[in-house]
């Protein structure tokens, strides 16, 4: 076991510290159809990154959401890959990571959430807390990620706001601190009252211009209140009194510790409430946080460059058949042409042409600091979980594989395309789209996923990106576990006795394939010295 080493002495670079302080790296999480993609577009609109929702700046055509760039996403209207978008607003530089919106893609979503310092949770005001929201909040809670809540679609027929807050608190186990409060709902939605600024923002449907300033009134005592909202004024006054009396006021320390979420109400499709969320991110969300490595904790303002790969994306540009490693900078400053140490292999590599993103649009990055996400052109040498440093032996922690819940075997329409099939599956496996296993008893690669849609996505990408027409059939496997044993002889005996149920993963780790839950339980009872793991760290060779 490696002993913890102290952090190296820091030279103290005021310019670096200033740049790091400006960064806000966050994700947007929600259940499918709660309005996550719309909010993503509107934040980019307010940040000046795009001119109108659905189109990248300077593009003359294309109606797809900026963040849904992959062909299969455009066809199906769901987010299946994680886009990265950088934009500025005020004095801050925002790195927005758009997570997959479909329930099948929890593993990729988890990896994205390891790379952020805060999150916006979007809740559909008509549906409240949904299944995917619960799962994502559990992931955020593992790292005490600060969460801002945006309750969306107030211009539709929705549930009572107090009921929604109670549901968030009781199901998600996080305290709510309302920052804005709705005035009416559905067709009678009139705007919101800002509890901290003592200001009423009046709603007007159909405003698509980010520069639009919604009409405002100063405070609940404004003489125009009853004139403008004759049907809602009394209810608003009583609700605000109730909220202030029973609800918790916003507390920055509780928010940063992940114990409290500030809550905003609005309508993303109409830009209403978006500016307030963006200002909250700017004012309250943390700048890049320290990161835990196996050896020590790395501070974001340390002068030496460090970071980790949290995602591999193949064929972002089909014309160039490229692969990009998404890399979270944890300390120091990136500059083109710099030499870094690849921790897993121990080899040095040069990063000459890193890029920054706007979904699939990219441009060369000439500078990046902690919190920034850069793309590194990758020809197979980088894997998810890899750490790069300026020489120090560090390995960042916290990017796991989960045991798949579904398993399939590929079936080729054309047997002569077997080489292309294997190449495609291995590359998609490295990317994290699926997990790929090589069974001891069969030459056919085995594919593991956390949801059935992943197999459809892989089949589509094999066809469009690798020219392989393949279908997938059930492999008859219930679950998988990574196995380790400190006794080499005992492990050899286990391997010999269970060879028909064993496979290797992409990193060469031993995996036990159980066709039923009973089979797994029996194996654990028969081999008590063997450990069966349902997760492992990326890039980790289990021993």
Swiss-Prot record:
GO terms for molecular function: GTP binding; GTPase activity; translation release factor activity, codon nonspecific; translation release factor activity, codon specific. Coiled coil: none annotated. One of its GO terms (cellular component) is cytosol. GTP binds at residues 30-37, 98-102, 152-155. It is found in: Cytoplasm. The keyword Oxidoreductase does not apply. It comes from the Bacteria. Disulfide bonds: none annotated. Keywords: Cytoplasm, GTP-binding, Nucleotide-binding, Protein biosynthesis. Pfam families: EF-G_D2, GTP_EFTU, RF3_C. InterPro entries: EF-G-like_DII (IPR053905), EFG_III/V (IPR035647), G_TR_CS (IPR031157), P-loop_NTPase (IPR027417), PrfC (IPR004548), RF3_C (IPR032090), RF3_dom_3_sf (IPR038467), RF3_GTP-bd (IPR041732). GO terms for biological process: regulation of translational termination. Increases the formation of ribosomal termination complexes and stimulates activities of RF-1 and RF-2. It binds guanine nucleotides and has strong preference for UGA stop codons. It may interact directly with the ribosome. The stimulation of RF-1 and RF-2 is significantly reduced by GTP and GDP, but not by GMP. Belongs to the TRAFAC class translation factor GTPase superfamily. Classic translation factor GTPase family. PrfC subfamily. This is Peptide chain release factor 3. The lineage of its organism: Bacteria, Pseudomonadati, Pseudomonadota, Betaproteobacteria, Nitrosomonadales. The gene is prfC.
């Amino acid at each position: 076991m490696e002993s913890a080493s102290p952090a190296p002495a820091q030279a103290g670079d005021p310019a670096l510290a200033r740049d790091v302080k400006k960064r806000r790296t966050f994700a947007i999480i929600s259940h499918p159809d709660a309005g996550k993609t719309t909010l993503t577009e509107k934040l980019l609109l307010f940040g000046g990154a795009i001119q109108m929702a659905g189109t990248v700046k300077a593009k003359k055509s294309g109606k797809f959401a900026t963040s849904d760039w992959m062909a299969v996403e455009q066809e199906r209207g769901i987010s299946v890959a994680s886009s990265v978008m950088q934009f500025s607003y005020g004095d801050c530089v925002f790195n927005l990571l758009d997570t997959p919106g479909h329930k099948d893609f929890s593993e990729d979503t988890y990896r994205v959430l390891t790379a952020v310092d805060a999150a916006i949770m979007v809740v559909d005001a008509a549906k409240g807390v949904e299944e995917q929201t619960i799962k994502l909040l559990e992931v955020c809670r593992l790292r005490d990620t600060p969460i801002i809540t945006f309750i969306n679609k107030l211009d539709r027929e929705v549930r009572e706001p107090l009921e929604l807050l109670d549901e968030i608190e009781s199901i998600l186990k996080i305290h709510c601190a309302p920052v804005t409060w709705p005035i009416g709902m559905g067709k009678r939605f009139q705007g919101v009252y800002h509890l901290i600024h003592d200001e009423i923002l009046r709603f007007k449907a159909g405003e698509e211009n980010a520069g639009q300033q919604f009409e405002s009134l100063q405070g609940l005592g404004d003489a125009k209140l009853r004139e403008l909202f004759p049907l809602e004024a009394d209810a608003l006054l009583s609700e605000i009194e109730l909220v202030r009396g029973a609800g918790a006021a916003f507390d920055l320390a509780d928010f940063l510790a992940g114990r409290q979420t500030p809550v905003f109400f609005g309508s993303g499709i109409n830009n209403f409430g978006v500016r307030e969320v963006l200002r909250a991110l700017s004012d309250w969300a943390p700048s890049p946080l320290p990161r835990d490595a196996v050896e020590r904790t790395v501070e974001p303002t340390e002068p030496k460059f460090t970071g980790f790969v949290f995602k591999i994306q193949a064929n972002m540009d089909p014309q160039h058949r490229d692969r990009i490693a998404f890399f979270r900078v944890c300390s120091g400053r990136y500059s083109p042409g710099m030499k870094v140490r690849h921790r897993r292999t121990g080899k040095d590599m040069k990063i000459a042409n890193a890029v920054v993103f706007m979904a699939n649009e990219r441009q060369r990055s000439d500078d990046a600091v902690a919190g920034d996400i850069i793309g590194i052109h990758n020809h197979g040498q980088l894997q998810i979980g890899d750490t790069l440093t300026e020489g120090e032996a560090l390995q960042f922690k916290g990017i796991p594989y989960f045991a798949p819940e579904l398993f399939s075997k590929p079936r080729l329409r054309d047997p002569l395309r077997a080489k292309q099939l294997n190449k495609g599956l291995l590359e998609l496996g490295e990317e994290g789209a699926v997990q790929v296993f090589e069974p001891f008893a069969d030459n056919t690669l085995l594919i593991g996923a956390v949801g059935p849609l992943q197999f459809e996505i892989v089949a589509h990408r094999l066809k469009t990106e690798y020219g392989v027409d393949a279908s997938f059939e059930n492999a008859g496997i219930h679950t998988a576990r990574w196995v380790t044993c400190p006794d080499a002889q005992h492990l050899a005996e286990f391997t010999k006795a269970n060879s028909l149920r064993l496979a290797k993963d992409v990193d060469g780790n031993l995996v036990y394939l159980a066709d039923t839950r009973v089979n797994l339980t029996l194996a654990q009872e028969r081999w008590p010295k063997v450990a069966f793991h349902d997760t492992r760290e990326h890039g980790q060779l289990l021993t």
